[in-house]
């Protein structure tokens, strides 16, 4: 009867292994971003508050952050899928900075591979929580699958106030001002922009 002991051990091992695979398969995954949406976000970075209108338009290869600082004016952060970006104002200062990254805007499935951390109540919503490569902690409503909160590795927090799937900003609003294309550009701080995403994309290109 001694031969049965190794057989029992093998059966137990197969059962445990299968259970682990089933448990992993049952873990929720982040919902891919819709190809077009508009989100109004309340930002908090160590008490520095701002509101951001985020217009994501994967269909047309563009992304736009319109940033209203608590004690400042409005700045515009415009990105294209060819890696070109502009950060500018529309006031009399006519300030603009431009840049070129090796990668374009975030893909709809950029959260693929995120580590599931469990569930947590945030602002009255029961959320699934994921961590993406020590870059962002992403909170998504269990029922509606809409994003509720993002916490970046820098400590910046984004609270998603409204989320409109399919909303598209008019084409004429996507045109950077002519002074962004002058050889001499006035410098402009990108303090209020979602610079964490730019850093993430730069790492992804390596």
UniProtKB/Swiss-Prot annotation:
The keyword Signal applies. Keywords: Signal. The keyword Signal applies. Residues 1-25 form the signal peptide. GO terms for cellular component: plant-type vacuole; secretory vesicle. PANTHER family: EXPRESSED PROTEIN, TRANSFERASE, TRANSFERRING GLYCOSYL GROUPS. This is Uncharacterized protein At4g14100. It comes from Arabidopsis thaliana.
